């Protein structure tokens, strides 16, 4: 019987691979394989990447994302709502690569991320531009500012529940006009449906 490989570390260029244990990498690949989801495409071989993932409509997105990060073995830091970094869980989520987002102080967050990126020769910063699982009309533009200040490429990652696939899409080069860039990106993602499509 032909074995279907839905995820492979070879989808990540060497300079963007993490230093996770073989066990964690196997857990990631096993989790994706038994879930029936597939990772399509490859992470581009760029020095610095700001990765945005959408549509974000379910708590399951986080679990799928962590399995994919482990399986692909990406060297990544991700932004998450500060409320999940509670005492007892804070160290765990930071170990997973998490950076808490305090929405009342966005400039401090951007400064923090910029400092993290500057310390690394190569790294991926991941975030969800909607900023919430709820349906929103206008996405946040922090990722555009972070990409500009860190001289990073923007990588579009889509979650498509009907096909059970996470698609590693194309690199987006900002024009400098945040409104036009955001409109283009939101239109790109409009063809994909999240796990809870009514929130897309």
Name the predicted role of every residue range.
Residues 12, 17, 33-191, 199-200:
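Soluble catalytic domains of membrane acyltransferases
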Residues 4-25:
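Helix-enriched interaction subdomains in cytosolic or periplasmic regions
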């Amino acid at each position: 019987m032909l074995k279907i490989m839905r995820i492979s570390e070879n989808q990540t260029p060497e300079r963007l691979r993490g230093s996770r244990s073989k066990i964690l990498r196997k857990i990631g690949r096993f989790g994706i394989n038994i879930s029936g989801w597939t990772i399509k495409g490859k992470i581009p071989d760029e020095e610095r990447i700001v990765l945005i993932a959408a549509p974000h409509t379910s708590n399951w997105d986080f679990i799928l994302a962590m399995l994919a990060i482990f399986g692909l073995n990406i060297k990544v830091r991700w932004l998450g709502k500060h409320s999940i970094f509670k005492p007892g869980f804070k160290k765990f989520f930071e170990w997973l690569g998490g950076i808490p987002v305090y929405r009342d102080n966005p400039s401090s967050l951007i400064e923090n991320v910029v400092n993290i990126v500057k310390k690394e020769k190569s790294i991926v910063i991941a975030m969800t531009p909607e900023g919430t699982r709820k349906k929103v009309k206008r996405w946040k533009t922090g990722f555009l500012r972070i990409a500009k200040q860190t001289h990073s490429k923007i990588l579009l990652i889509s979650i498509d529940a009907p096909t059970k696939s996470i698609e590693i899409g194309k690199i987006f080069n900002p024009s400098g006009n945040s409104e036009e860039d955001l409109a283009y990106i939101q239109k790109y993602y409009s063809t994909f449906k999240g796990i809870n499509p009514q929130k897309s």
